[in-house]
Amino acid sequence: MNKKLIMVLSVSIIIVFIGYIIFDTVKPAGSVKNETKNAAIVEIPDAWKVSAEFKVNEGYLKAVAVNAAGTIYLGGDSFVSCYNKDLKLIWNVKTPSPVTSLSNFGDTVFASTMEQILVMSPAGKILNQLGPFEDSCIITSVSSNKKYVAFADAGNKMVFILDKGGEVKKMIGQNDRHFVIPSPYFEVALDNENNVFVANTGLHRIETYSIDGVLKSQFGEAGTAPGSFCGCCAPPHFALIPEGFVTAEKGINRIKILNKKGEFVEFVNSKNNFIKSVPLNLASADGKTIYGAYPADSKLYIFNRNTTP
């Protein structure tokens, strides 16, 4: 009796399994949902090209910033250099520690090390050193506007908002531990309206906060589709441009432009020989020229729109 029952159950399971296979095979294509953001990616040509490459000899290159006049600031291990728009050296300053990121507003340059923010004059003189701020601090990004300086601390998974005198006005992520930061890629950017843009890299999105730390909006998802962010922690770097954002990725080392809603616009550079795991640090003053500092070869890559068909 038990053998008959087992046989009946076995036959029933086989019939159900075969039926599922038949249904899955014959169901119309229109009923198949896009189950992955990585499926059937359409080939999209790059809309930009590398117009120049510039080898940096001052040291290991990690960061770039640029102002509206085209003045370029480069930083790394352990230096900050200033170049004019024709890549002629204006000044070079040795720093007490390796520089992890750069920002400038008006006539002031801000250079972050792992524990401090260096405040520099247009001539390269170090005017002030802000910090240290917290134990286990790993500053990965600094940004400034008319009133505030913001920096991202990957060690403590927080964003600090300072006034120009260096006083801490707000710490975002302090209580809710909201930021998921698997590796030392953690970017922040301030705009002129005091919006704070933060790359929550472990969640593959860019989040917008008020200066008081209130979450206003967010966008982004993991994947290899043009509008998604690839890699374990993405976007590792981004810069604000008038159109929206220019973002870097790793895993697939590509640079792209997203509009202010986070929607894909175009690829700046997706077909290259860059090391997959080493993203470019990005800067742009006008959205017409994009600068990428590449640590793997200590070169500055300059991108302009491709005018050829």
Regions found by a protein language model. Give the residues of each.
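Eukaryotic scaffold repeat domains enriched in small/polar residues
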Residues: N2-P309
